[in-house]
Structures are given as structure tokens and as C-alpha cells.
Amino acid sequence: MSTPRPAPPQPGAAEGAGGPEGKAVAGAWEKGPRLGQRLPSIVVEPSEADPVESGELRWPLESAQRGPSQSRAAAAPSPSLPGEPGKAADNAGSECACSEDPAAPARG
């Protein structure tokens, strides 16, 4: 991989001998790494809303679904339920089948 650094002087020599072909190949090769260096990185910053446990997923409409407990259980599967205090024991058995047991949220 140390050969790419001396590569820029070589296309100049290939230009005179090979014509525009050497220039096109060198231009395509040079643009690739430059674009890769300018790609933005993804930064995740903590929000100041509600503190969320590590790994807990929340749907954007969770606040609208807090009223009817049955629709919340059907719409928000296990990722948001285990984080609730007091309901972790009840939801442990219904994690995979929360839609099959609609009475589970009514217990707690």
C-alpha cells in the first residue's frame, strides 16, 4: 500500500507517453480516496428528554399510545416494555407473544 504515494508523479510521465488515458485513470483513482476521507461520521448525542436505558428502543408515537394499554401492547413490542419498572416480571413471559395475551397489560 506504500505505492499510492509515489503514484502522482507517475501519471505525469504516462501522460506524455500514453496520452489522456493515463490521466483519466489517475483522476479516477485519486478521487476515490479523497471522497472517502470527506465522508461525515455519525455522531449520537444524548438527548435532554427522558433518560432512556442503554439499548432501549422507543417508537416516536409512544406518548400518544399511553392512554389505551391494549393498543400500546400491540403497537410497541418488547423493546420498550422491559424498561418499565414494575412490569418487567409480568412481561417476561409475554415478550414473544404480547399480541396473543391482550390481558397482560391490564394486570399491572
UniProtKB/Swiss-Prot annotation:
Residues 37-62 form the LBH domain. Residues 1-11 have a biased composition (Pro residues). Coiled coil: none annotated. Residues 1-108 are annotated as: Disordered. Pfam families: Lbh (PF15317). Disulfide bonds: none annotated. Residues 63-85 have a biased composition (Low complexity). It comes from the Eukaryota. This is LBH domain-containing protein 2. It comes from Homo sapiens (Human). The gene is LBHD2.
